[in-house]
């Protein structure tokens, strides 16, 4: 390695001072956060409630028309056919 380069690396670089802007403080002045008593709320949630029946439309099934038939593929025969073609 070049001796000039080694000495430049050894001396290091002169860095300029960086000014930082701390924005971690709250943006709204004169605001206090109050402690909320959640015990009454939690008691209300724990009580049994009467719920209304909800009508749902289940569209999670496959959207294949009834006149379309999907047949099962014999995977073993299919793979052996590919294997035979690869050996040729």
UniProtKB/Swiss-Prot annotation:
The keyword Acetylation applies. InterPro entries: Actobindin, WH2_dom. The modification N6,N6,N6-trimethyllysine is found at residues 35, 72. GO terms for molecular function: actin monomer binding. It holds the Pfam family WH2. Keywords: Acetylation, Actin-binding, Methylation. Residues 37-54 form the WH2 domain. Residues 1-22 are annotated as: Disordered. The modification N-acetylmethionine is found at residue 1. Is able to bind two actin monomers at high concentrations of G-actin. Monomer. This is Actobindin. It comes from Acanthamoeba castellanii.
